[in-house]
Amino acid sequence: MKNLLCAVMLTSPLLYSTAVFADDAQQLRNTLVNTASLKTDFKQTVTDVNKKVIQTGSGILALAHPNQFYWHLTSPDESQIVADGKDLWIYNPFAEEVVIMDFAEAINASPIALLVHRDDTTWSQYSVTKKQDCYDIRPKAIDSGIVTVSVCFKNSQLTKFNVLDDKGNISQFDLSNQKVITTEDKALFKFVLPENVDIDDQRLKTLN
């Protein structure tokens, strides 16, 4: 969960110039125009530094511009992350807990933010390098917890992304059944607070 947020995913050859990075970032931005909204199934595989599988999972991912995000892990243990553009909600049914965070504070720590952000300020926080059909995204902040996020496309459609964290773990997310968000799907970005759950409102801590 932490890796997804810091990731919900950065070296390049020294011969590449700053201008090349800028061009690669612009190419990625142009490609993401075709991903203004997306709903897809995903399968997650996490391997450690020794390439041993330490976790698997599956669920549903949805993205919409501007700044809307839905993540529902359905197996093996259920969890949800929902961003409505202002607030971000993290729901753990097993712990019966909901954490609420300011969207900008939470999502800006993640290279995945680039999938739903279009503003120059957010993009300036990352370096982008194109490698065939994939783009490696590196946060410029050294304490992000994420080393690289690689997002891959086929025929301009997002097909997978990988997250490499600072412990050497790689989280691979393979996407399938991609489709454009429908009017009915927009309800996914509105979190409905369950009854009888503990609430940890991080927004209040940010303000104080």
UniProtKB/Swiss-Prot annotation:
SUPFAM superfamilies per record: Prokaryotic lipoproteins and lipoprotein localization factors (SSF89392)
Q: Which Pfam families match?
A: LolA
Query: Per the record, what is one GO cellular component?
Result: outer membrane-bounded periplasmic space
Looking up InterPro entries in the UniProt record yields: LolA/LolB/LppX, OM_lipoprot_carrier_LolA-like, OM_lipoprot_carrier_LolA_Pbac
- Keyword set includes Membrane: no
* Compartmental location: Periplasm
According to the record, the signal peptide region is 1-22
A single Gene Ontology biological process assigned to it is:
lipoprotein localization to outer membrane
Instruction: Please give the chief subcellular localization of this protein.
Output: periplasm
Q: Which HAMAP family match?
A: LolA
Give the protein's biological function.
Participates in the translocation of lipoproteins from the inner membrane to the outer membrane. Only forms a complex with a lipoprotein if the residue after the N-terminal Cys is not an aspartate (The Asp acts as a targeting signal to indicate that the lipoprotein should stay in the inner membrane).
Protein family membership: Belongs to the LolA family.
Q: How does it assemble?
A: Monomer.
Q: Under what name is this protein listed?
A: Outer-membrane lipoprotein carrier protein
The encoding gene is lolA
